[in-house]
Amino acid sequence: MGIKVYKPTTNGRRNMTSLDFAEITTSTPEKSLLVSLKNKAGRNNNGRITVRHQGGGHKRHYRLIDFKRNKDGVEAVVKTIEYDPNRTANIALVHYTDGVKAYIIAPKGLEVGQRIVSGPDADIKVGNALPLVNIPVGTVVHNIELKPGKGGELVRAAGASAQVLGQEGKYVLVRLQSGEVRMILGTCRATVGTVGNEQQSLVNIGKAGRSRWKGIRPTVRGSVMNPNDHPHGGGEGKAPVGRKAPSTPWGKPALGLKTRNKKAKSNKLLVRRRNEK
């Protein structure tokens, strides 16, 4: 999918870019796989903001995505490649030979009419899903499970990929895009290939209104707030932070403080941390 550059007809259009959606084959989603999605605007059940900078934006329907890929041995045909407003990756509508329809994350190179299949005996081909233990070393994968049968949780964003490095007992070593090397149970499934729509990260939003269409509200610096709104607020003019270290709006240390639990059970499954040289 290419990048479309706009002419600077207005200040908002200057430097604005978008995807050309050349890979998208239909603009009408499969109605049976849509669910209504209520706009929470970052509020919880008490009406309090729990996630800042969310609200407004265009109405959306949620597309039910098959992250489990557990219909073993049943072949499916790719019918369409579609846009999904709820994620950066595109999605593909597949029709199984037993009549079931499903959406999957569209990997790079997947085309309409292509046949895909899941299961331990599936070929190492883009779009096929297999247990990690059945995937050869060096293969690029995405949509990786962390618990067998739970569905893919890792490597689902546009352009993301991971690589199978080897096997240690019942675990398989996988290198994630961050550089982290992690041990994952060999019975967990992954899909062969890289997630498509990799040029999505190159898009220049161009103007504030386009962020609002996406439901993203402005982020205001703490230093321009009042003291009752933020620890950095107050003072005359461009005042410094006035504390030993920068703080979050709730007074906790920000910028550089490690937040990972040192006693996390998954620590023993990390072979190499993402920030190790």
Swiss-Prot record:
Residues 259-277 have a biased composition (Basic residues). Keywords: Ribonucleoprotein, Ribosomal protein, RNA-binding, rRNA-binding. SMART domains: Ribosomal_L2, Ribosomal_L2_C. InterPro entries: NA-bd_OB-fold, Rib_uL2_dom2, Ribosomal_uL2, Ribosomal_uL2_bac/org-type, Ribosomal_uL2_C, Ribosomal_uL2_CS, Ribosomal_uL2_dom3, Ribosomal_uL2_RNA-bd_dom. It comes from the Bacteria. NCBIfam families: rplB_bact. GO terms for biological process: cytoplasmic translation. Disulfide bonds: none annotated. Residues 219-277 are annotated as: Disordered. Belongs to the universal ribosomal protein uL2 family. GO terms for molecular function: rRNA binding; structural constituent of ribosome; transferase activity. One of the primary rRNA binding proteins. Required for association of the 30S and 50S subunits to form the 70S ribosome, for tRNA binding and peptide bond formation. It has been suggested to have peptidyltransferase activity; this is somewhat controversial. Makes several contacts with the 16S rRNA in the 70S ribosome. Pfam families: Ribosomal_L2, Ribosomal_L2_C. Part of the 50S ribosomal subunit. Forms a bridge to the 30S subunit in the 70S ribosome. One of its GO terms (cellular component) is large ribosomal subunit. This is Large ribosomal subunit protein uL2.
